[in-house]
Amino acid sequence: MAKQIQAIRGMNDILPNQSPVWQKLEAVLRDAVAAFGYSEIRTPIVESTDLFKRSIGEVTDIVEKEMYTFEDRNGDSLTLRPEGTASTVRAGNEHGLLYNQEQRLWYTGPMFRHERPQKGRYRQFHQFGVEVYGIASADIDAEVLMLSNMLWQKLGLTEHVVLEINTLGDSDERAAYRDALIAFLEVHKDKLDEDSQRRMYSNPLRVLDTKNPEIQAILADAPALMDYLGEESKSHFSTLRELLDAVGIQYRVNPRLVRGLDYYNRTVFEWVTDSLGAQGTVLAGGRYDGLVGQLGGKDTPAVGFAMGLERIVLLLETLELAKDVPAAVDVYVTAMGDSCVPAAFAIANELRVALPGVRIMTHCGGGNFKKQIKRADKSGAALALIIGDNELAEGKVAIKPLRNDNEQQLVAREALAETIKALI
């Protein structure tokens, strides 16, 4: 027997019994962005490697260790996208969507990072993101946080996530702070772990994000970024907090919060949860006013966020919030004998036209009554329709409830759609 081919490590199938919770999540995401008037953008999975080197930064873990990069037959270096923001900016620049315009966009799709697979984190993962361009004021920062908050409300996760916010200031303020932080870290260099020493000069703000408790203790005495902010950055952050207070979104200021990508400035935020064990991030983002210019466009203010859908699915399943996801089938149509199959197909088609949104499956493959009802029950359908010679002769169809103890009933064919509508 030929050797069975397996999926690549860290790249998982989403099987039919798993799809309903994904479909529920995706429907919530689409409803939320529609409620805020955002437009969808779709970009290629494969991009020029330079796009991510210029946006994410060459000395980040993503570019150095995690990207899937290869040369095509023309010798061009290409990369499977590790995140969605850079591709969205590239598309906006290329098609003239960003300069002197306001754009509220969203995207979803697979991303790729070669990191150690673990529960909720995979080498191919699905990301949902929101990006807004052309608005520099703090009110749009508040809006994207309102949108993210709506997602938790619709998913029943509000009590299980916490919003953390911080400000990184502008590039000049951050540069001054960077110098002060490096000077502080140099004093304690011998006590830093290998990862912090590696980042100390290339990306010192990332040292603040360490999970090492010994380094965290050292950083307790580090200079505070807030002390290096000018009035404009302080005012921006203050306005954001006022707007969050006004709409009742609770948050905590985390002065150690930085983002893993180099392009962020001013507002940064994360929604975190401890419902998956150790505290973990389930949604993150912030403002990145310099990235559009960095990638060849005109300087354009921008803010956005992204979330990994595998983490959200895991959270829903862990909290047992995925149990109310409906079955894939509402009505299962059976035929008692080959002579009834044409009528069963015709009735199923009539119902699909009369009841849009109701999921109707027709039994195929023959079999006796017991086998067909067993299949109907296994499908998860609420109702089985029984099409038999005697019923057809009377112009009727039998409806058998499968999820309660209600009795089977005979219904005239012309009243079938309305009866089903009332029952499911």
Curated annotation (Swiss-Prot):
One of its GO terms (cellular component) is cytoplasm. Its EC number is 6.1.1.21. PROSITE patterns: AA_TRNA_LIGASE_II. InterPro entries: aa-tRNA-synth_II, aa-tRNA-synth_II/BPL/LPL, Anticodon-bd, Anticodon-bd_dom_sf, His-tRNA-ligase, HisRS-like_core, HisRS/HisZ, HisRS_anticodon. It is found in: Cytoplasm. It comes from the Bacteria. This is Histidine--tRNA ligase.
